[in-house]
C-alpha cells in the first residue's frame, strides 16, 4: 500500500505541473496566434505573473466576482462554464467594436486592446474553479497596456505594418521618387 501511495504522490508531482503548464501554454499560444495576425511580437510567459494570476483567480472564484486587482500590470478577467482557453477568443472578439481609425480606450474593447498591446512583452495566466463549477481566468501583462495616447502605435489593425517597417517603406518611396 505504501508503495502505491508513494508512487501516486510521485505521479501527482510530475503530472500536475505538466497539466497546469498545458493551460498556460495554450493561452499563450492563442494570444500569440492573434497577435501575429496584427504583426505584433510574441509574448513570453512570466512565472511570477502566472503565480499571482492563479492566486487571484482563487480569490475571485471564491467570491464569484470579476473585480480587477490593482497592480503595475494589465489584466484581463473571464469566467467560463467550460474550456477556459476560449476566454482568449472572447477577448479578441471585442475587435468588432474597436475603431482603428480613432484609436483610444473603451471599456467595450479593453480586453482586446490589452491582449494585442504591442509594448507588452510578458504575460501570466491562472485559473480556478468556483464552488458552483465556473472557471475563473486571470491574465496579466507587463508592461501594462491601454495607456492613454499610445493606442495608435500599440494596437495595429489586421495585417498591420510594423511601425519600424513603415519608416523603411517611406524611405524606399522617397528613394524611388528621387531616382526616377
Describe each region flagged by the PLM.
Residues 4-20, 168-179:
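Cleavable N-terminal signal peptides of Sec/SRP-targeted secreted and luminal proteins
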Residues 18-22, 80, 107:
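Conserved, non-catalytic sequence blocks in retroelement Pol enzymes and Pol-derived host proteins
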Residues 19-73:
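Short, well-ordered surface patches within globular domains
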Residues 66-80, 84-88:
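A solvent-exposed, acidic/Ser-Thr-rich amphipathic alpha-helical stretch
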Residues 81-180:
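Disulfide-stabilized extracellular recognition modules
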Amino acid at each position: 500500500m505504501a508503495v502505491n501511495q508513494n508512487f501516486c504522490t510521485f505521479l501527482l508531482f510530475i503530472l500536475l505541473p505538466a497539466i497546469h503548464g498545458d493551460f498556460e501554454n495554450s493561452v499563450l499560444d492563442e494570444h500569440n496566434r492573434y497577435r501575429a495576425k496584427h504583426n505584433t511580437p510574441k509574448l513570453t510567459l512570466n512565472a511570477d505573473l502566472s503565480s499571482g494570476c492563479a492566486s487571484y483567480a482563487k480569490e475571485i472564484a471564491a467570491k464569484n466576482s470579476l473585480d480587477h486587482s490593482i497592480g503595475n500590470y494589465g489584466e484581463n478577467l473571464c469566467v467560463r462554464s467550460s474550456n477556459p482557453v476560449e476566454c482568449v477568443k472572447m477577448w479578441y472578439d471585442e475587435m468588432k467594436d474597436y475603431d482603428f481609425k480613432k484609436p483610444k480606450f473603451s471599456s467595450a474593447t479593453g480586453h482586446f486592446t490589452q491582449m494585442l498591446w504591442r509594448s507588452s512583452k510578458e504575460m501570466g495566466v491562472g485559473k480556478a474553479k468556483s464552488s458552483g463549477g465556473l472557471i475563473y481566468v486571470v491574465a496579466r501583462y507587463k508592461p501594462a497596456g491601454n495607456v492613454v495616447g499610445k493606442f495608435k502605435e500599440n494596437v495595429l489593425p489586421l495585417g498591420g505594418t510594423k511601425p519600424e517597417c513603415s519608416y523603411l517603406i517611406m524611405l524606399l518611396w522617397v528613394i524611388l521618387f528621387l531616382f526616377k
